[in-house]
Structure formats: structure tokens, C-alpha cells
Amino acid sequence: MGIVVIGDVFIDIKGYSLSPYIPQGRNAGTVIQIHGGVARNVAENIANIELQPTFISAVDDNAMGEDVIQKLKRHKVETKYIKKVPNGMGTWLAVFDNEGDVVASISKRPDHKPIEQILDEYGDEIFKDA
């Protein structure tokens, strides 16, 4: 029986202040960018325990979207039901203070229509062995 994970891919952009955060000021620190999204994280973690899930989602139709797909493939996630489209991924921008607490964030949600289209077109095929 196969495991199917359905959901969003996000790109998380996280900024970490090196000293006490000043909301109206400039803050020196570090900024990282990582692949995120709860469903993407779940699919990757399931694959890390060698269960080879199928992931149904969408990614942006650019190099970042392709990078997400390639990383999932390296983890042995089945990616044939990931659609490349404009606005396929969400973005989460978070700012952390020097103690690691979130002090600000903005989230851009992706378009969910591509996932609906995948399920409409391939749902029977996807779930027959799930």
C-alpha cells in the first residue's frame, strides 16, 4: 500500500537578528532560504524512513521549483504528480529575534487550482494502491 501526501510547497525565507531586534530600525543578522511547506516536509520525512511516498502538489515553473522537485527525488519521493505552474509555491518570510522567537512574518499562499486539476485528472490512478 502506498502513502500519498497532498499539499503545498513553500519557500521559507528566515532572517535571524544577531542582537536585540529593533522593529523600526536596521538589524544585522543572517538570512537563509529553505524548502518548506507542511506537506512537502511530511513527504520528505516519510521518504527519510524509506517509505517512498507519492507527493501531489504544485511548484513554480522556474529554477526554484525544479530545485524542489530534484531534492524530493533525491529523497526517493515520487514526484510525477507535481505540476509546474506560475504561483505554484507559497512563500513564508519570517524574522526572528536574537533569542530565536518570531517577531514578524508574512505569508503568500500558492494557487491551489493545480492540485485540484491533478486530483481530477489522476485521482483514480493515484489512490488505487494507496
Regions found by a protein language model. Name each.
Residues 1-56, 63-67:
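Glycine-rich phosphate/adenosyl-contacting loop at the front of the ribokinase-like
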